[in-house]
Amino acid sequence: MMAPLLKLGFNGIIDAVDLDPVGHRLFAQHCPGWADSVRFTKADAVDWLAGQPRDFDLLIDDLSVPRDDDVFKPDISWTVLPSLIRQRLRPEGTAIFNLLPEKTGAWPEQLQPMTRLFPSSQTVHLSDFLNRIWIAGNALPRPATLGFRLRHSLQRLESRQAQRIRIHSGPPRPKRT
């Protein structure tokens, strides 16, 4: 995540929270020049966020748990964490959720109550992936504006995804049958 952020001009500190420090150790080992930009805490994400003395401009839920040869979103990502993220965002803040459908391709029923927490939201579809990036907050740019900005940023990064994204207002839509 750091390489694209730095290439796009980000120069802040990122707080990363995980119960398993292996990913951060690998990051620090292979990207030592960027390690100072990440403040890692080994903790439960809910406990950590609830205990923070400040609110945030941006919060990202990328929580997933390995199972067999796959990964899934634990229940806490659909229930407790979204409302806590909503509470800890500044009024102009943005929440980004990396959502994964169930094995059937359907979205969990917990998605509906989660989406009611935010007055404005958009979903980013990356054609090469099953997950959806759900962006939420009090006010967001129109999907066309967000799509233009996102494509432009991806082009600056020379990412093939620049031409493979679609954006629509609202939460992820049910799988078409």
What are the residue ranges of the model-derived segments?
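The AdoMet/dcAdoMet-binding core of the Class I SAM-like
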Residues: 1-88, 104, 129
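A generic structural signal for alpha->beta connector loops
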Residues: 11-13, 35-37, 92, 118-120, ...
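Low-complexity, flexible helical/coil segments
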Residues: 27-30, 49-54, 92-100, 131-135, ...
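Residue-identity detector for glutamine
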Residues: 29, 52, 87, 110-112, ...
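Residues that form generic nucleotide/phosphate-binding pockets
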Residues: 48, 117, 149, 153
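C-terminal substrate-binding/active-site "lid" region of AdoMet-derived donor-dependent transferases
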Residues: 69-75, 79-143
